[in-house]
Every structure is written in structure tokens, then in C-alpha cells.
Amino acid sequence: MIYAHHGHEIDFTATDVAFTFADTRPVAEGILAEPFLSGRSVPVASPALVGTDPVTLSAEWLLGVGLLHDSDLSGWKTWLARSSTVVPDRLPGAIFEDFNLLRAAALAGQGVALCSLAMVGPDLKEGRLVQLSESSVLDEFDYYLIQSNLTPRDAGRRKARQTFLSWIDDARTQA
């Protein structure tokens, strides 16, 4: 198992299992890819940041409370354009290369983040985050579970891989 970074090739002769985020199912020799989670992303924030009054998601309001970006500015630029909101020339806000850091910043009330509903579902259900709009981005993207077709030679590695895949299947069934 590896921690895969966006835009980096994964060597499946050395890696058994990986997750990727893509707009189409990955196809390559020696791998099996299956859809895992939807990438559909919506604006979310901490209830403490939003308060109890209804929120109008204008560019002014969003810039006032702060935007939290995942990897780059494209998500918010797309969301603002799709929402018929004027896209400012400059989009300030922290940029996170790791989704878990982005999520932590949103939970801590540091701003509004565009997050995959599948990834923050428990936070929304438990009231740790609130969804601010149905308008979404990355609807065409999904998280994919990719497995190498090669069977690990090492018995311990085979067992670890199977244990992990069984755990993933159980977790997905319970979700």
C-alpha cells in the first residue's frame, strides 16, 4: 500500500493496492480498477463558522470567511462560475495538498472547503460540518480502488493485501 499523490505514476510491480482520483476508470496492463467513492464535491464548513442565520453564498461572503483549497484554485473557480457567482481575479485562501488537512481545517472553522460528499458524509451526519449548497463540482470524478494483477510472492504480503481488501469491502458494505 502506498500514499499516492495526484499526478504521480504508480509502479504496480512494487505496489499491490492504491486509490486514485480520476475522471475515468484507470486502464492499464497489470491492474484491476473499480469505482470506490464518488468525487462529487460541495461547499462545507463548520457550524461554528456559519452560525445560525441562513447563509447566502456570495463571493463576498465566501472571501470574508475564507476559502480552503484542495491542491489548487480550480475547484473554487469552477464552483463559483457554475453558481453564477462572479469569480474574483484573485482567490485567496490556504491550499492543502492533503485532503485530510483540508478536512481538518474545515472542521476547525478556518474557512469553507469543497469536499467530496462521500468523504465527509459522517461529518455531515454527525453535525461536525454543514453542507452549504447543492451546487457541486467534480461530479465526473471518482475515487478508484486499483489492484495489481500480480500476486505477491511473499506470503505475509499476500495476507496483508487480502486482509486490507476484506476490511475495505466490509467498510463499504456498512456505509
What do these predicted ranges mean?
Residues M1-P26:
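Central regulatory/effector-binding core of bacterial HTH transcription factors
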Residues H5, T20-T24, S46-P47, D98, ...:
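Beta->alpha turn/N-cap motifs
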Residues E9-D11, L32-P35, S58-E60, T85-V86, ...:
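Short secondary-structure boundary/capping segments
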Residues T13-T20, S41, A106-V112:
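Alpha-to-beta junction loops
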Residues A28-L67:
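Flexible hinge/capping segments at coil-to-helix
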Residues V65-S84:
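Secondary-structure junction motif
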Residues V87-Q131, L138:
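Hydrophobic hinge/microswitch elements
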Residues L117-E126, E134-A175:
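C-terminal effector-binding regulatory domain of bacterial HTH transcription factors
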